[in-house]
């Protein structure tokens, strides 16, 4: 059974657009590369043909995985979410107890994660540690160099 993932409407559209690009642009390119390599003669010693077939296999595997993700994707109506605790698509402001640094993140699905824009995956260590927390709670998060404690300062939705 595949895992259900939750997306914003924009995130799901981006995922579908990428899948359509793979099917409509990359798949025909892979077939064309195989055809060109096949036209070069003996297939038993044709490294170009072997490479093109392998690339096509990897592309088909990627398409298959993306189709599964899209099939199990659910769009979240952010206006209906509980703002009293951290959930997927929550914005959360946290404070590191060790150094006092404050950070703001939005928890999103793995495929929407982008640390530069402040979007972290709900499957990341920080994301997992924050899920279900309320304002005033302390999240203890295991990181490679130990445990970090964060205070939840604020939770909101856009």
Swiss-Prot record:
Pfam families: GreA_GreB, GreA_GreB_N. Keywords: Coiled coil, DNA-binding, Transcription, Transcription regulation. It comes from the Bacteria. The keyword Transcription applies. GO terms for molecular function: DNA binding; RNA polymerase binding. Residues 24-43 have a biased composition (Basic and acidic residues). Residues 24-47 are annotated as: Disordered. Residues 48-68 form a coiled coil. Disulfide bonds: none annotated. GO terms for biological process: DNA-templated transcription elongation; regulation of DNA-templated transcription elongation. The keyword Transcription regulation applies. InterPro entries: GreA/GreB_C_sf (IPR036953), TF_GreA/GreB_CS (IPR018151), Tscrpt_elong_fac_GreA (IPR006359), Tscrpt_elong_fac_GreA/B (IPR028624), Tscrpt_elong_fac_GreA/B_C (IPR001437), Tscrpt_elong_fac_GreA/B_fam (IPR023459), Tscrpt_elong_fac_GreA/B_N (IPR022691), Tscrpt_elong_fac_GreA/B_N_sf (IPR036805). Belongs to the GreA/GreB family. PANTHER family: TRANSCRIPTION ELONGATION FACTOR GREA. Necessary for efficient RNA polymerase transcription elongation past template-encoded arresting sites. The arresting sites in DNA have the property of trapping a certain fraction of elongating RNA polymerases that pass through, resulting in locked ternary complexes. Cleavage of the nascent transcript by cleavage factors such as GreA or GreB allows the resumption of elongation from the new 3'terminus. GreA releases sequences of 2 to 3 nucleotides. This is Transcription elongation factor GreA. It comes from Christiangramia forsetii (strain DSM 17595 / CGMCC 1.15422 / KT0803) (Gramella forsetii). The lineage of its organism: Bacteria, Pseudomonadati, Bacteroidota, Flavobacteriia, Flavobacteriales. The gene is greA.
């Amino acid at each position: 059974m595949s895992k259900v993932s939750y997306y914003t409407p924009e995130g799901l559209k981006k995922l579908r657009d990428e899948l359509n690009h793979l099917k409509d642009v990359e798949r025909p390119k892979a077939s064309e590369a195989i055809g060109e390599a096949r036209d070069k003669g003996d297939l038993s010693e044709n490294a170009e043909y072997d490479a093109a077939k392998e690339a096509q296999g990897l592309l088909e595997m990627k398409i298959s995985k993306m189709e599964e993700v899209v099939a199990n994707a659910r769009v979240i109506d952010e206006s209906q979410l509980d703002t009293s605790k951290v959930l997927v698509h929550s914005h959360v402001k946290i404070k590191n107890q060790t150094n006092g640094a404050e950070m703001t993140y939005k928890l999103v699905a793995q495929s929407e994660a982008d640390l530069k824009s402040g979007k972290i995956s709900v499957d990341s260590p920080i994301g997992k540690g924050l899920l279900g927390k309320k304002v005033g709670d302390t999240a203890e998060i295991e990181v490679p160099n130990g445990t970090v404690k964060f205070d939840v300062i604020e939770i909101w939705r856009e």
